[in-house]
Amino acid sequence: MTDRSSQGGERGRGVSARAVGFLCLFVTSAGWGINWPAMKVLLREWPPLFARGVAGLAAAAILAVVAWRIGESMRLPAGIGRRLTVAAFLNVFAWMGFTTLSLTWVSAGQGALLVYTMPAWALLLAWPIHGRRPEPRAVVGLVLCFAGILTLFGGGIALRVDQLPGVLSALAAAILFALGTIVVAPLPLAPFAAVTWQLVVGCVPMVALGLALEHPRIDALSTRGAALMAYMTIVPMGVCYLTWFAALRRLPGEVASMVTLLTPLIGVIAAAIALGEPLGARQAAALVLVIGGLAFVLRGQSKKRRLGSEERARRGRSV
């Protein structure tokens, strides 16, 4: 009786942990998705590099306080400078910089869909860099993703010349971030320390470039702009990182990656509601193709990792 009750209690705790994990993922996806129209509105008052860099540095300060409160060390190990610089360039400077720049030329919904093709680019880049050939399922996913991009811009017919810099910026963000997932090994730092240091190293040059090239007017920020700035600092780069790490403690990484496919969906819908951006048959078809394609890509990757783990386990047992 005791064994049954203890097993039931463990199952109950497992279900509860998974429920909390999925709730954390929904908060993460919603926070990141809503940030797309928020950034688009903020760019009417502050230029992209300066705005995103300032928000990143403010978020780094908040995360540093969180790390201190939970007892995480912020000390950098010796010899980590080069790895940290490369990681910060790909994961923060290129990702946040090009993402925000893209919104100067394309809509928030278009930017969200283009940027979140990064798993597809990671799959393509892993082939020449590590010799990992895509599985057939993943190839189907790649075709669907690129079909979705073409659909989004009407097969290229609806792509205006003035949108091209935005499309290239969004794709640069996706490709460089994907490159970072392949060539940059995890930093030997605690989670919040790793994010904080990357934000600092990546956002300082962003602010410097913004001051030198964009000449921002600090007093141009309205009350609404300040509220959006606070949201961009606290929610996507603060709360969402907290909920993301909380979800990873309760759910497998593959599951977490799949659920975050909600982010571009939420971004497109939020942009349609808040900014009146188009949300018709073409946008819906592009969403289905891109998100469906990414689901194929991620499932193919998780299956390959699972088979690799099983093979290593069999080898271990045979030794």
Map each language-model feature to its residues.
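Transmembrane alpha-helical segments that form core, pore/gating elements
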Residues: 37-40, 49, 60-63, 122-124, ...
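C-terminal-most transmembrane helix of multi-pass membrane proteins
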Residues: 2-14, 55-57, 65, 154-155, ...
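Helix-helix packing/entry segments at the starts of transmembrane helices
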Residues: 52-54, 92, 96, 108-117, ...
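Juxtamembrane helix-entry segments on the extracytoplasmic side of multipass membrane proteins
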Residues: 17-22, 45-53, 76-82, 154-176, ...
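Specific transmembrane alpha-helical segments of multi-pass solute transporters/efflux pumps
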Residues: 31, 35-36, 64-115, 151, ...
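Hydrophobic transmembrane alpha-helices of multi-pass small-molecule transport proteins
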Residues: 57, 63, 117, 125, ...
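Hydrophobic residues within membrane-embedded alpha-helical segments of Major Facilitator Superfamily
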Residues: 24-27, 31, 38, 58, ...
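Membrane-helix interface residues
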Residues: 46, 106, 132-134, 189, ...
